[in-house]
C-alpha cells in the first residue's frame, strides 16, 4: 500500500505466510550473531548489528524474495525504470531497553526495515522531513502541520 510522508513515497507491506518463517528467521539472526559476534556499528546503540551481507544467507531467502517483489512493484508504481538490486541487508538485535538506532539517513536509495519480532511497548520508527530547513523554525510559515510540512512522523513497527 503506497503512503506518503512529506511527499516522499512510503510503502508498508505484510509478508505473506510470515508466521511460517518467523521463528526460523529469528533463530537464524541469533546464529548469525554467534558467527559474527563483533558485528558492525552503523547506527545501532547498545545492541547488535550484523554485517551487511545478510541477504546472501539462504535462511532468509523467503524474506528477500518478498522484499524483491515489493521493491519491483514499488518502482513500477512510481514509473522508475531500471533494475532493482538489493545491495545490503543486516539484522539488529535490541535486547534491552537501552538499545536504539541513532537517527541516520539512507540518501538517494530505497531503504526499508522488516521487523521479525516486536516487544510490547516497543518504540516507534521515526521519519524526519528532509525538506524542512531548521532555520525556518519560529518564523510561523506553517500554521497547521500536515503530511508535507510536519517535522516528523512516527509509525508503530508491525511484525512481518
Description of each model-found segment:
Residues 1-81:
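Non-heme Fe(II)/2-oxoglutarate
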Residues 34, 87-90:
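Short, charged low-complexity linear motifs
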Residues 56-88, 95-109, 113-120:
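Active-site region of the double-stranded beta-helix
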Residues 7-10, 86, 122-123:
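Sequence-level motif detector for i,i+2 pairs with an aromatic at +2
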Residues 91, 95-160:
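Catalytic core of non-heme Fe(II) oxygenases with the double-stranded beta-helix
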Amino acid at each position: 500500500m503506497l503512503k506518503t510522508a512529506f511527499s516522499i513515497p512510503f510503502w508498508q507491506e505484510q509478508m505473506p505466510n510470515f508466521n511460517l518463517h518467523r521463528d526460523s528467521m529469528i533463530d537464524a539472526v541469533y546464529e548469525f550473531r554467534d558467527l559474527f559476534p563483533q558485528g558492525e556499528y552503523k547506527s545501532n546503540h547498545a545492541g547488535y548489528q550484523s554485517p551487511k551481507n545478510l541477504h546472501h544467507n539462504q535462511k532468509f531467502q523467503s524474506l528477500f524474495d518478498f522484499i524483491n517483489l515489493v521493491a519491483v512493484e514499488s518502482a513500477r508504481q512510481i514509473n522508475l525504470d531500471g533494475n532493482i538490486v538489493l545491495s545490503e541487508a543486516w539484522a539488529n538485535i535490541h535486547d534491552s531497553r537501552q538499545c536504539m538506532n541513532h537517527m541516520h539517513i539512507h540518501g538517494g536509495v530505497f531503504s526499508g526495515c522488516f521487523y521479525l519480532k516486536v516487544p510490547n511497548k516497543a518504540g516507534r520508527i521515526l521519519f524526519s522531513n528532509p525538506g524542512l530547513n531548521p532555520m525556518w523554525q519560529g518564523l510561523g510559515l506553517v500554521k497547521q502541520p500536515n503530511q508535507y510540512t510536519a517535522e516528523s512522523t512516527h509509525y508503530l513497527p508491525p511484525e512481518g
